[in-house]
């Protein structure tokens, strides 16, 4: 009788991670357990043994001439070269937030840089699809005729900046919401690298290769952010696209360079 009683108690008292739960656990308990599991998976170290990009012996910002890294920069995450003069990563919460912002901005910058250069490259090689210079193409929506996507009026003919804004907010917001919320069932444990349908090519299947791809993504993303900043400055100063500016510089580097434009730049002209 005692044995059957204890066995029925064991069956009616499920456990989660070694902790006994009630028969009808509250949503708060399950939510806390799910959050704990997601948090532990998110903060799991990605450093791989023998990788030159992770760990205490990783590549530093000045190579062999680098000073001692701050104690909080352990080489656990990609893109950590042991340099943080301003102490932006000292607080773990701030570091986690800034790390996410950097990765997301890197991805947008890489897409943006490609979008600024590729149409102009095609146009200079005989492919015609309307305005090719990135900032001039976007401004066409304010013209009387509106903006034709890819120069084709039958594709998307945009005449309202508010409609474009609303469409982007809905489409981009839906994807971002899916990523941040961890998917409809909470199956995504790392919102920065969600995998699944966000990785149709299976690039994250090999942990070693995936760890290296994270470093490559950040390195290229940081370059892309600097590139986008340069494209903005070029657009303001010269009124030309990046490839046209490059061609002008190569044709006459003495008169077409950053110094000559900086000394002769007059705002509004």
Swiss-Prot record:
InterPro entries for the chain: Chloro_AB-bd_pln, Chloroa_b-bind
Gene Ontology terms, MF aspect: chlorophyll binding; metal ion binding
UniProt PTM comment: Photoregulated by reversible phosphorylation of its threonine residues.
Binding site for chlorophyll a 6: 249, 258
Protein name: Chlorophyll a-b binding protein AB80, chloroplastic
Transit peptide boundaries: 1-37
Role summary: The light-harvesting complex (LHC) functions as a light receptor, it captures and delivers excitation energy to photosystems with which it is closely associated. May channel protons produced in the catalytic Mn center of water oxidation into the thylakoid lumen.
Residues with the N2-acetylarginine modification: 38
Annotated positions binding chlorophyll b 5: 168, 265
Mutagenesis or variant effect for residue 176 to A: Decreases binding to chlorophyll-b
A Pfam short name: Chloroa_b-bind
Species whose genome carries this gene: Pisum sativum
Residues holding chlorophyll a 3: 140, 150, 217
Residues involved in chlorophyll a 5 binding: 216, 234
Effect of residue 249 to F/L: Decreases binding to chlorophyll-a and chlorophyll-b. Causes a minor decrease in LHCII complex stability
Cysteine-cysteine disulfides: none
Family: Belongs to the light-harvesting chlorophyll a/b-binding (LHC) protein family.
Residues reported in the UniProt entry to bind chlorophyll a 4: 220
Cellular location(s): Plastid, Chloroplast thylakoid membrane
Subunit structure, as described in the record: The LHC complex consists of chlorophyll a-b binding proteins.
Annotated positions binding chlorophyll b 2: 107, 156, 185
This protein's domain notes: The N-terminus of the protein extends into the stroma where it is involved with adhesion of granal membranes and post-translational modifications; both are believed to mediate the distribution of excitation energy between photosystems I and II.
Binding-site residues, chlorophyll a 1: 83, 89, 102, 222
UniProt effect for mutating residue 105 to L: Decreases binding to chlorophyll, more chlorophyll-a than chlorophyll-b is lost. Causes a strong decrease in LHCII complex stability. Complex stability is reduced further
UniProt-annotated binding residues for chlorophyll b 1: 61
Transmembrane residue ranges: 103-123, 155-175, 223-243
Record keywords: Acetylation, Chlorophyll, Chloroplast, Chromophore, Magnesium, Membrane, Metal-binding, Phosphoprotein, Photosynthesis, Photosystem I, Photosystem II, Plastid, Thylakoid, Transit peptide, Transmembrane, Transmembrane helix
